[in-house]
Each structure stands twice: as structure tokens, then as C-alpha cells.
Amino acid sequence: MVYTSTYRHTIVVDLLEYLGIVSNLETLQSAREDETRKPENTDKKECKPDYDIECGPNRSCSESSTDSDSSGSQIEKNDPFRVDWNGPSDPENPQNWPLLKKSLVVFQIMLLTCVTYMGSSIYTPGQEYIQEEFHVGHVVATLNLSLYVLGYGLGPIIFSPLSETARYGRLNLYMVTLFFFMIFQVGCATVHNIGGLIVMRFISGILCSPSLATGGGTVADIISPEMVPLVLGMWSAGAVAAPVLAPLLGAAMVDAKNWRFIFWLLMWLSAATFILLAFFFPETQHHNILYRRALKLRKETGDDRYYTEQDKLDREVDARTFLINTLYRPLKMIIKEPAILAFDLYIAVAYGCFYLFFEAFPIVFVGIYHFSLVEVGLAYMGFCVGCVLAYGLFGILNMRIIVPRFRNGTFTPEAFLIVAMCVCWCLPLSLFLFGWTARVHWILPVISEVFFVLAVFNIFQATFAYLATCYPKYVASVFAGNGFCRASFACAFPLFGRAMYDNLATKNYPVAWGSSLVGFLTLGLAIIPFILYKYGPSLRTRSSYTEE
């Protein structure tokens, strides 16, 4: 069948193979070819390279170049039982997939990210009704938003390293967590006490995190390196657009039925996404595809000596090493690396400001302009316009600043900071504009949203690219720490946001001084890209984490 051959390693095709309805003839032929290759020396020296859980698919985490290591590596490569790609044009290698298949995979990972990510803010239109039904205050009800955000900051600490192992891969994590995410939406829709709702929202946040944590990894699995920044930017734009579209959908559900239908909608969106991914989303993680090939070769030949290099390395990692790499190292790097600490703080404050808007919007658009729930949802469309413009600006800056430096050999990681330096002023501008023009006309706060996304989107892209380039060996730890800091601030800001605006409000300017407070904070933090552009090279030379 064309479907089973094109979409191998999907959940449906895997199930059909397990039930014996279809068979993998290509793998069987490969197994027979491998059986004809006999090892020249069965007593070869075993190579045991140093292992790091965060080692990428094409990067060795051990930098030793001794003769014994080189000899062991050469023997390992000549081992006839070591499963690898069948040459550079192997059709199972995700980098060699047809463009249509790659495009469908990118679309699906964007859809998965949007559906799960919108779960954070889709709740906000129903918050007042939840307060009334459960007889709780604003802060307690806001925990349903805050703990969801905290959950998807905690999840990547465990899920990201697991997704890089040969045994688990990305697909299994996506599908298992999405299934339980869907189930927990049923719980949220039927719960009858605020404590149960808060707990299920927190768990839902953890379950939604794999798409946020490893979606970029999926893109990198299938897209050629020169195109990765642009495709990642498109995926990131979708991730930003999702939580600002969600309040409109949530408002429509509350307006049509009640707050519980918000979670029924999220459940049905999750179910539709689950079905689509089950049929058309294949495994993209290179190590897992090779691991599957090795398992089939063992089964078809009856020879258990077939193995993959990454699975062999994974087995050498004990629980203590795994916990150190996933829990301790991100915190240690934040404390010891000034560049990481500075950008984690900058990104965290910017992300917290984003979720602060969910507290400010009702004050402005309901309190001043008397918008309905749906109209307030439409007021978030300024963020969506900003996403489109921000992605276009990112592409222009990338082509004008980054690409020429790659081509003429003058590229350094600090080149990415030029992008952040160009747009960092937009962040405080957006906050001042939102706060001080709230009573002039409703369109001006909406315009401020555009400036906000122009800044935040490009600062995020520049920061992540800079940190990944500076710390390639420990990029998973860097991003795990950044994600946790980001989610912690985004969790906290909505909890004190309403009190901050109420206490700093004046009669004519209800959100001006509150917005200005965080605006001045972001204005002070805007100096970070400039400082690191100047002192970044010297900081890298003194860092033990950037040594090759």
C-alpha cells in the first residue's frame, strides 16, 4: 500500500505491523543484505565513548582524540551489526523525505503546538463564571492559568532528554501525552470543585509540554540546516499566535453555552489532532528510527547482535547521571554563566509581561470600552498581526545580518544579538503605549500589541540562537533552564497583576502606572544584548561550558 510505505513509523502503521496486517519488506531485504556481511574480527575491542544525555545526533559529546579512541571508533564503524543509514540517500532518513511529507509534518507539529499551547489562555474568558460557581476570589481562580503555565515549564526538564533517547523518540511522547491531555480536558469540563480543577490544569500543563519542548527538535530532524531558522521561526510564530487566539474561542464557548464548554472544545480539538497525528505523523528522531530498524532486524534474523550506537550509549547512563544532566546542570549553568543568567532574566520578564496582558485587557476593554467577551477576544488580534510582521522582520534581519556573515566567514554568535539590539526598544514602547493611551481610543492599545510581539518574537529567536551557538554541547540544559525561568515568571505575573494595576491606578489612567512599572524594568533589561555583544567573546573564553 502507498500509505503504509509512505507513512511508516506512524502509530497506525506500527499497529498494522504489530497485528501482522502489513509487513515491512524493505527492512527484511535490508536484514538479508546485512546477514551476508560477516565480521572480520569478532573479538574486537569495544568502544566506550564518554556519554552526555544532551549529545545531538551528529555531535560527539566526547572530545578525546587519543589513538585508542580513534581505533575503537574505526572498529565500531566497521562492525557489521551496527545499524546505521544505508548511505546518504537512505529514504528512511527524515532529511531525505519528499517535500510534501516534510510540509505535512511541519503543519502537524504546528497544529499540535497550537492546540496544546492555547490551553493556557483559553480559560480566561470563563474565569469570572468559575469564581461565581465555586465561590472563590480572583487570585485563586487565576491559579488555573498560572499553574498551567508552570506545568509546561516543568515538563521539558524530563521530556526533553527522553525525546533524545533512541528507545523513546519523539512520537511516543507526543502521542501518549496528547492522549492523556485529552482525557484531562474531560475532567476539567466535569469537575465540581476548584481544587480538582486547579490540579487537573497543572497536570494538563505538564502534558502539553512535549510539543513546546521538542517541536523545534522535530523541525530540525527533517529540515536542512540552512532552512531551519526560517521554519523554526514559522513554528514559533504559531506558538505565539495560539494563546492570543484562544481567548476568542473561549469567549465564543462561554457566550454560546458556559465555561465548561471551553474544555469540551479543547478536548475535541485535541481528539482531532490525535487522530490526524496517528495516521500521518511519523517518527522523526533519527536515533529512534535506527533503533526500530535494529529491533526489526533482530526479530527477522533471530540475531540479537544488531544494535545502534545511540542505544548503546543510552544504556550506559545510570539514574544518577540522568538526574544530574536533567535537574542539576540547568540550575548550575544559570548560576555560573552570566550570559545565561542575563538572558534567562530578560526572556522571563518579557514572557511574564505577555501573560500580564490577560489581567490588563478586562480592565481596559471591559472597564473602559464595555466590550463583550467576544469583542475582548477580538482585541487580541493585534498580537496575531504582530506575529506576521515579526516573522517577516525576522526573515529580513536574518538575510541581512546573519547569512552574509556565514558566507564571508566572519560569523560569531554575537551576530544574533544584533537582531535583539534592533528591536529591544519596542518592548518598553509597547508597554508605555498600552498604559498611557488606554483612554484615548481602543485601537491604540491594540497597536501596542504589534510592537510587543515585534520585540518579544525577535528577542526570543535571537536569544535562543545565541545560546545554542555558544553552548552547543549543553543546549538541552540551557533551554530547560530558560523554559523553567520563563514559565515561573509567567506563572507569577498574573497572580499579582490585578493587584498591581488596582493599587497603582488613577481615575484617568487605570493601567498606566502598572504598565509603566514593568515598562521601566524592560527598559533597563534592554541593555543586556548590548553588553553581551561587547563582552560576550571574553565571557566565552572564561567559560568551562563553551570549551570544545
Curated annotation (Swiss-Prot):
Low complexity compositional bias, start-end: 60-73
Entry membrane topology: Multi-pass membrane protein
Biological processes, Gene Ontology terms: xenobiotic detoxification by transmembrane export across the plasma membrane
Classification via SUPFAM superfamilies: MFS general substrate transporter
MF (Gene Ontology): fluconazole transmembrane transporter activity; xenobiotic transmembrane transporter activity
Top-level taxon of the source organism: Eukaryota
A Pfam family it matches: MFS_1
Transmembrane segments: 104-124, 139-159, 179-199, 203-223, 230-250, 261-281, 347-367, 376-396, 416-436, 440-460, 476-496, 511-531
InterPro entries named in the record: MFS, MFS_dom, MFS_trans_sf, Multidrug-R
Cell compartment(s), UniProt: Membrane
Cellular component terms (Gene Ontology): cell periphery; cytoplasm; nucleus; plasma membrane
Family: Belongs to the major facilitator superfamily.
Name of protein: Fluconazole resistance protein 1
Organism: Saccharomyces cerevisiae (strain ATCC 204508 / S288c) (Baker's yeast)
